[in-house]
Amino acid sequence: IVVTSHYGFAYEKPDESSQPVSDVVAGNRLKWEGSKGHFYQVSYPDGRKAYLSKSISQPEAEWRASLKQDVESIIETAYSMMGIPYLWAGTSSKGVDCSGLVRTVLFMHDIIIPRDASQQAYVGEHIDIAPDFSNVKRGDLVFFGRKATAERKEGISHVGIYLGNKQFIHALGDVHVSSMNPADQNYDEFNTKRLLFAVRFLPYINKEKGMNTTNKNPFYQ
């Protein structure tokens, strides 16, 4: 059973007024044990059992069949994370850091990519960004950090999802949209000055090491 809501609870009984067993977040997977009314009975890796509302979860096969992995669906999911607080090392809909936002959004579409921005930067297709951003597409990842010099290579320290028109969504303080256009009200001068390059990842899922769907990942078998 896959949790499809950003946040919720699993309960001791098939009743939301009963004692919670744990909280759950989007993408959590629990073992199906049966159904009772509007609930799935599920079990945890440690043996605990609980009831999970069908309104916030789906059987894995049903969930996967309904999945969309196109750019617009992924961006829509990213927008649904707006306002979620920044949490260093966070990778859930309760709190994220910059690379955790990217990883969490993609995981909600059954896509697994490396955890850290410094790893995410070197998968897929590297794109040197044109001055007018004409070669960057919606859904590309944009990376920021220390620019390379003759003495040392670049240092990746931040990542966001490109939305088009020099706008990107990222986690810094919280999840929000910033602009790399000085004329925009949400202009982010700090990150614009340290923009490095973009990465196009979607065409390379299940074709390149480090980027796959859960049904192709041994850990989830």
Model-derived regions, located:
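Aromatic- and glycine-rich peptidoglycan recognition patches
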Residues: I1, E16-S18, Q58, G155-Q221
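Surface-exposed beta-loop interaction hotspot
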Residues: I1-V2, H6-G8, E12, D46-Y86
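Short, basic/aromatic beta-hairpin or loop at an interaction surface
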Residues: I1-Y11, F107-Y122
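Beta-loop motif signature
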Residues: V3-G34, Y86
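Soluble non-cytosolic domains of exported or imported proteins
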Residues: S18, K68-E72, S92-D97
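SH3/SH3-like beta-barrel superfamily modules
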Residues: S22-S55
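Active-site nucleophilic cysteine motif
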Residues: A78, G90-H109
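...with weaker cross-activation on analogous glycine-rich loops/strands in unrelated enzymes
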Residues: P114-V177, P182-D184
